[in-house]
């Protein structure tokens, strides 16, 4: 039995992932953005070992979440599932940071940097990472005309870079990125082609399986298969630069 933290577990892929893990006998700690959603996830995943609460659109709450989550650990695996989709207009958080970048990139970085190291880290990305571009001087899309889909795609490429950077930084930890597919969730929309259980399958497999194919690090997966990510994700200088920008924006450096 493994102990697993799943962020963003109140609906969609995160909730399905938590249910699948609990259903196969694993100890699961679930995460909700606020107390109201915590009530919902307790109903949805009644056998969860614990619920931790924190809004990933707040650096202060994300730091507190790392502490609260560690109290419920240690973990064999952490699945960084929580995320937000493209927005119609550029939104900023209480920290003055762009919402999509903060929730999708800075929050998993901060949790990774602050929490005790698990044996495995899984970062959910999207097939749209293939369309992403990294502009280190404008990661938060403050310049030019706002494009929510572009901001989302770029954030998902950042998630792949983050997974690969962590894999290199911590060779003793298995860190991988997962494209769950176009899943029928609130974010995926009614036109999505893939059923919800399929979206949870590969994150669960990477988090707990002893299959040799799952015991790797620094890889990009879809449907339990290693695929090639956006070529930019393999740029080690870009990986280091992203870690440095995340450290600057959060005030926390990824420890050795």
Label each PLM-derived region with a short phrase:
Residues 45-60:
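Rossmann-fold cofactor-recognition segment
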Residues 83-84, 88-89, 97-98, 120-172, ...:
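Catalytic loop of short-chain dehydrogenase/reductase
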């Amino acid at each position: 039995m493994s102990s697993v933290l799943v962020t963003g577990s109140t609906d969609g892929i995160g909730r399905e992932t938590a249910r699948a893990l609990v259903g196969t006998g694993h100890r699961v700690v679930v995460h909700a953005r606020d107390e109201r959603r915590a009530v919902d996830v307790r109903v949805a995943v009644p056998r969860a070992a614990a619920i931790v609460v924190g809004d990933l659109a707040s650096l202060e709450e994300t730091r507190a979440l790392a502490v609260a989550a560690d109290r419920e650990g240690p973990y064999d695996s952490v699945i960084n599932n929580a995320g937000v989709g493209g927005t119609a207009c550029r939104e900023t958080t209480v920290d003055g940071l762009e919402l999509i970048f903060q929730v999708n990139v800075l929050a998993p970085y901060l949790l990774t940097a602050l929490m005790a190291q698990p044996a495995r880290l899984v970062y959910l990305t999207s097939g749209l990472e293939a369309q992403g571009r990294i502009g280190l001087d404008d990661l938060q899309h403050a310049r030019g005309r706002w494009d929510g889909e572009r901001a989302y795609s770029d954030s998902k490429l950042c998630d792949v870079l983050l997974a690969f950077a962590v894999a290199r930084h911590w060779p003793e930890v298995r860190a991988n990125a997962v494209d769950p597919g176009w899943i029928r969730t609130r974010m995926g929309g009614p036109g999505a082609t893939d059923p919800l259980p399929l979206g949870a399958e590969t994150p669960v497999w990477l988090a707990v399986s002893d299959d040799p194919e799952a015991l790797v690090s620094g890889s990009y997966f879809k449907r339990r298969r290693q695929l090639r990510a956006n070529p930019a994700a393999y740029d080690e200088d870009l990986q280091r630069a992203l870690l440095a920008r995340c450290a600057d924006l959060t005030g926390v450096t990824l420890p050795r």
